[in-house]
UniProtKB/Swiss-Prot annotation:
PANTHER family reported for this sequence: UBIQUITIN CARBOXYL-TERMINAL HYDROLASE
Matching SMART domains: UBA (SM00165), ZnF_UBP (SM00290)
Keyword Repeat: yes
GO cellular component: presynapse
Function, in words: Deubiquitinating enzyme that participates in a wide range of cellular processes by specifically cleaving isopeptide bonds between ubiquitin and substrate proteins or ubiquitin itself. Affects thereby important cellular signaling pathways such as NF-kappa-B, Wnt/beta-catenin, and cytokine production by regulating ubiquitin-dependent protein degradation. Participates in the activation of the Wnt signaling pathway by promoting FOXM1 deubiquitination and stabilization that induces the recruitment of beta-catenin to Wnt target gene promoter.
Name of this protein: Ubiquitin carboxyl-terminal hydrolase 5
Length: 858
């Protein structure tokens, strides 16, 4: 490179900007690749736009924008000089002390074992004229000051990726207890010794809790595996109502573990020193002698059997490197994202759409490619498939490998993709753990929005569902079709093969709890896959069905079949459900999924000879005997508590009152409960509850339900507001006509997500309207030429499949735990566990959560 002259620097001086507080500085990662300052060519940061580019792409930005001056940042890593453990020569590995990722004391998945030598230069394109950061001394003061200010501001500014991380996930963020400042403490308490404690009701000498009201020392709860305590502390609370207890052995001058039985959570007690002194305990003199609850939970998570099996822990696995074997760094509970995109980019359609067309996508990228969906997805796909980032982690720039990291690769960190895909979303924009199935559907939706009328890789998953409803009173039927992307497979626990073992386990567990002894070894239910498939296809009774043949309520049965079979069948095992108390829980179940799958028997047949269709008559919107002014519930006029001006019209819908009452009693807002029942079509409490759980974070969650053509509070009809053009375009890109898109949006108060649901559930009505258009004087040719065929494009073929990939979840809830995926590549199973990519020795196919089957083509 030639040396930068004063004249050259003066020529670009007007384009050099000093970043301000609101500017996004992309100094960690290239906008088009995963090159970083540690890459061989370093990173070039535009000193005008503050976008970062690798050596391969910096000229692309120069040619597109004309920006010539860049800050070239290059870092070389070297091992940190640390104290070594005695006799081993290895640095001591820090043990996590917090149930968190990415915060001090938490799980550090990218532990910083290195220090960096940094080389900073100013470079002017296209000739790559350069001057070192410390070589500005000979320039005129005004030039030197301007350039130095810009350079220092760039180097000291928080990077865009850091700003986008709203917060690192912390599973032990604790709130101040409501009892902390007014806790009642009994007079004349016993003095508590500084050590030698024992439960006052049994012989336990660990996991002991001091009640801060009366000074009782009692053992803690029993854990699911039988360890822990004998529940004496919680039993004492039930008897006395004394709410706060501190765990003995965790008290230090910095604090202690405090639990509130009333609030059922770990809490903070700002008055802890005062509360302890009441019993003669000097907090400043105490030392830690027992594990904190966080440490115990971390230990439990790391040794629980499900985690061991799914991650294939304890088995030496061969690391894999090269194209298609690139790991993804965990950005703080982003394993759900990592698992989903690894599977998607193992599918040829996604490779063709984004990776094969990489150059075209990059050429058409806007000035700021970090905000372009197609660019960031193409960048992600190339990063995973190119092999450029799938190499063993290196110790330094000389290429020496790190011995203790030989099974780990640097991989890629998709920060820009995560920020863009989660932008504006109440959940995916955070660093909290998420449901992989929900993220899969969110990503599918984003692909739909951005593909418009171009090639759409989502077609590999899309299929039509045929639903048949049969009125039992008249034997007449109605067929409808809807689009779906996932087959949700129920788990019939009553079909478990080891019922006797399960009953025996439950009895032993009950006896152990009564006798306060360790619990027996866990027994996992073994449910045949065939039983799950039978449950999916089994008829479902529909009570209070409005029969258009009877013009009255009747009982019907609904059966679900496939109207088409997709190229790739996605099966979600419905492991996550709600208990009788509506608390989310995960079924601990083993289902031996078949390698070869044939679901041909689930293909729908459509209207059969001899079947008579139900009349296509819209049901009345209120029952004939319903009092005027009611909400349209199946109820009576005594339900005054449910009255609302928004539902006083005689055109109010019929809503199942019992379901609404159930949801309201669980603490959800009345208006949200009404919407849940309305948008799920009175299909029962479970469907309404699922709607509530998936829409809780919507900005309008608790807003009143405004029906199509009705007026909201203080507003005109929803139809008066024209649907947003971008929403119309999105629906049109999915294969519907503009008129259909407008109608769907108006019917759902201009909500894009609900409009898509609405249009899929009204395909038959849209077909009828299209036919009516023709019968009213429009020729078939005119109709075809002026509108797009109804419904999105689906592929169809035989219903025979082969298992291709599966995503597994470890933990008790989708809101916590960890995800990994297994993918079959080149005839072998491969496990993708964030950055670690290895050949799988024993893929746990019976414990998966989401399965991906590929059609077998004969």
């Amino acid at each position: 490179m030639a040396e930068l002259s004063e004249e050259a620097l003066l020529s670009v001086l007007p384009t050099i900007r000093v970043p301000k507080a609101g500017d996004r500085v992309h100094k960690d990662e290239c906008a088009f690749s995963f090159d970083t300052p540690e890459s061989e060519g370093g990173l070039y940061i535009c000193m005008n736009t503050f976008l970062g580019f690798g050596k391969q792409y910096v000229e692309r930005h120069f040619n597109k924008t004309g920006q010539r001056v860049y800050l070239h940042l290059r870092r070389t890593r070297r091992p940190k000089e640390e104290d070594t453990s005695a006799g081993t020569g290895d640095p001591p590995r820090k043990k996590p002390t917090r149930l968190a990722i990415g915060v001090e004391g938490g799980f550090d998945l990218t532990e910083d074992k290195f220090e960096f030598d940094e080389d900073v230069k100013i470079v002017i394109l296209p000739d790559y004229l350069e001057i070192a950061r410390d070589g500005l001394g000979g320039l005129p003061d005004i030039v030197r000051d301007r350039v130095t200010s810009a350079v220092e501001a760039l180097l000291s500014a928080d990077s865009a990726s850091r700003k986008q991380e709203v917060q690192a996930w912390d599973g032990e963020v604790r709130q101040v207890s409501k009892h902390a400042f007014n806790l009642k403490q009994l007079d004349n308490p016993a003095r508590i010794p500084p050590c030698g404690w024992k439960c006052s009701k049994c012989d336990m000498r660990e996991n002991l809790w001091l009640n801060l009201t009366d000074g009782s020392i009692l053992c803690g709860r029993r854990y699911f595996d039988g360890s822990g305590g004998n529940n004496h502390a919680v039993e004492h609370y039930r008897e006395t109502g004394y709410p706060l207890a501190v765990k003995l052995g965790t008290i230090t001058p910095d604090g202690a573990d405090v639990y509130s039985y009333d609030e059922d959570d770990m809490v903070l007690d700002p008055s802890l020193a005062e509360h302890l002194s009441h019993f003669g305990i000097d907090m400043l003199k105490m030392q830690k002698t027992d594990k904190t609850m966080t440490e115990l939970e971390i230990d439990m998570n790391q040794r629980i059997g499900e985690w061991e099996l799914i991650q294939e822990s304890g088995v030496p696995l061969k690391p894999l490197f090269g194209p298609g074997y690139t790991g993804i760094r965990n950005l703080g509970n982003s394993c759900y994202l990592n698992s989903v995109v690894q599977v998607l980019f193992s599918i040829p359609d996604f490779q063709r759409k984004y990776v094969d067309k990489l150059e075209k996508i990059f050429q058409n990228a806007p000035t700021d490619p970090t905000q372009d969906f197609s660019t960031q997805v193409a960048k992600l796909g190339h990063g995973l498939l190119s092999g450029e980032y799938s190499k063993p982690a290196l110790e330094s720039g000389d290429g020496e490998q790190v011995p203790e990291q030989k099974e780990v690769q640097d991989g890629i960190a998709p920060r820009m993709f995560k920020a863009l895909i989660g932008k504006g979303h109440p959940e995916f924009s955070t660093n909290r753990q998420q449901d992989a199935q929900e993220f899969f559907l969110h990503l599918i939706n984003m692909v739909e929005r951005n593909c418009r009328s171009s090639e759409n890789p989502n077609e590999v998953f899309r299929f039509l569902v045929e639903e048949k409803i049969k009125c039992l009173a008249t034997e007449k039927v109605k067929y409808t079709q809807r689009v779906d992307y996932i087959m949700q497979l129920p788990v019939p626990m009553d079909a478990a093969l080891n019922k006797e073992e399960l009953l025996e386990y439950e009895e032993k567990k009950r006896q152990a709890e009564e006798e306060k002894v360790p619990l027996p070894e866990l027994v996992r239910a073994q449910v045949p896959f065939s039983s799950c498939l039978e449950a999916y296809g089994a008829p479902e009774q529909v009570d209070d069905f409005w029969s258009t043949a009877l013009q009255a309520k009747s009982v019907a049965v609904k059966t679900t079949r496939f109207a088409s079979f997709p190229d790739y069948l996605v099966i979600q095992i419905k492991k996550f459900t709600f208990g009788l108390d509506w608390v989310p829980k995960k079924l601990d179940v083993s289902i031996e999924m078949p390698e070869e799958l044939d679901i041909s028997q689930l293909r729908g047949t459509g209207l059969q000879p001899g079947e008579e269709e139900l009349p296509d008559i819209a049901p009345p919107l209120v029952t004939p005997d319903e009092p005027k002014g009611s909400l349209g519930f199946y109820g009576n006029e005594d339900e005054d508590s449910f009255c609302s001006p928004h539902f006083s019209s005689p055109t109010s819908p019929m809503l199942d009152e019992s379901v609404i009452i159930q949801l309201v009693e669980m603490g959800f807002p009345m208006d949200a409960c009404r919407k849940a029942v309305y948008y799920t079509g009175n299909s029962g409490a479970e469907a309404a509850m699922n709607w509530v759980m998936s829409h809780m974070d919507d900005p309008d969650f608790a807003n009143p339900l405004i029906l199509p053509g009705s007026s909201g509070p203080g507003s005109t009809s929803a139809a008066a507001d024209p649907p947003p053009e971008d929403c119309v375009t999105t629906i049109v890109s999915m294969g519907f006509s503009r008129d259909q898109a407008l109608k769907a949006l108006r019917a759902t108060n201009n909500s894009l997500e609900r409009a898509v649901d609405w249009i899929f559930s009204h395909i038959d009505d849209l077909d009828a309207e299209a036919a009516m258009d023709i019968s009213e004087g429009r020729s078939a040719a005119e109709s075809i030429s002026e509108s797009v065929p109804v419904g999105p494009k689906v592929r169809d073929g035989p219903g025979k499949y082969q298992l291709f990939a599966f995503i597994s979840h470890m933990g008790t809830s989708t809101m916590c735990g960890h995800y990994v995926c297994h993918i079959k590549k080149e005839g072998r199973w491969v496990i993708y566990n964030d950055q670690k990519v290895c050949a799988s020795e024993k893929p746990p196919k019976d414990l998966g959560y989401i399965y991906f089957y590929q059609r077998v083509v004969s």
